[in-house]
Amino acid sequence: VRTVPAIAEGLEKLRSRVLIFCYQLSHIRSGKSHIQKSLSVWKPELERYTGLVQQIKEKSKERKALVAEKKELPIYHVKRHKALTVRIAELIEDLEELRSEKALLLQKFEYAEDAGAEEFRKDIATMEAGLKKLETQEQKYSTELDKALTEYAELKAQATEFDPVELYEARRAIRPVQEKESEKQLEDAMHEKPFLIMLLGAKQETSRLLGEDAEERQVRQLIAHKRQEQHRNSISKRKRSDPER
């Protein structure tokens, strides 16, 4: 049976579903943003790390070759000896700087001193897998949200035969309980209390998607119009009952 309380309850239940999906999507997008920011740091730093490792490898190889050459070089090749000594000293200095930079980079990401590029790749792969999982969830909840919005619009269309003010007031009366129930469902699903700021954002998004501001304005106008009518009727009645005035 289509009655004002039944329609009000149906609309508020659908509104609660919209609110839940808005919150979950906001939570997912926040997680995605966090991972994307991390990846934007990790990926270039992995390139930097592999670059440092490559430079250390090349300079170590060059130093080793020059040390061997110097060892084999006859003493009377004074000029070459000096050139080799200068170059070896430069390479030692370069290697110290590169190793120090590499150590600081590992420290920044809380890796062990002997960690290799594999550690970076492993963490990047974990983040990318997490991002993919969140993207799948985002798609799922976006579809669910669209479905709830369609159902809401269909039920709203059926409610046109009822007094909009009466329906609005019936909905407002049960909304606090429905919203509390939504928060409980979110807490059960996410194993944590909903974040207040995110929850407020989800409520604003729900209101926007359901066009609640326009609906509220319309109801206020109807109430104001009704009051004016009542006021006019009351004046007209008084005039009829007191013809001398």
Please place each PLM-identified region on the residue numbering.
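Extended intrinsically disordered terminal tails
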Residues: V1-R245
